[in-house]
Amino acid sequence: MATSTLDPAPAAGETAPRLAAAPSMRRSRTRGAIIRHCGLVLFGLFMLYPLIWMAVSAFKPSHLVLTDPSIIPTELTLENFINGWMVGGFPFWVFFSNSAVVAVSAILGNLLSCSLTAYALARLEFRARNVYFAIVLVTVMLPMHAVIIPQYIVFSSLGLVNTFVPLILPKFLATDAFFIFLMVQFIRGIPRQLDEAAAIDGAGPFRVFRSIILPLMKPALITTTIFTFIWTWNDFFGQLIYLTDSSVFTVPIALNALVDSQSQQGTGTLMAMSLLSLIPLLLFFAFAQKHLIRGIATTGLK
């Protein structure tokens, strides 16, 4: 005769404390979640306050920007955008186009040169490869100010000052060691069996790089694109050194010129143009943030 194997029902004395503790545990977790979310909201507002203040000040009259620090404006105007649109005799869209040319060229230069350099350091076998890679890593710790004077002397002797060449040419020479290191770490994670299989089929190093390595490097390439665009668009020091004519000014240099020309009462004008200069960055980051997070998670920064 079959016998039942069901466990005996727990005693009432055992379930009562658990049933009584369950609601209190849920309330405790709910309170903890509310406190964490409130803290995150307050921290987010604290971090966004300068951006919010700048956006509000862009629509305030210049005489109220510093005298009326409230977030809710008492008077709105568009005169700051009208007054700041012309800088040095040129409309502001000229500076946007100059920054776009420099940023896009820098992206292309870094993608081409850094990917080739990283592939050579990660895959090709040649003498002193580790020494070259160590030199690349050392340049990461070398401040820009240590090399800016020799670079300026070279470009000045070639007559390239006041052009975009000093800002673009180094990108095609793999001078951004951070991206080289990023791509080297990513390529080292790609199985070498893929290279060996391609070599058996007769593919050379460049064919392996173009047909196998490069398509698999998409996360690292996207990360390089995003960081290069942000850093180039916001660069001020290098562009200030090489660009002296208003016709080739980029957005950061134009904002600096706006401060000089409107230093008496141009705070609202500066806020208005600064707000416009942030729009490309915000749009670019909004569309690329998913790829940025994925790229960081799958490259050498993880």
Regions found by a protein language model. Give the residues of each.
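Short, Lys/Arg-rich, polar N-terminal cytosolic tail immediately upstream
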Residues: 2-29
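A structural signal for multi-pass alpha-helical bundles of membrane permease subunits
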Residues: 32-302
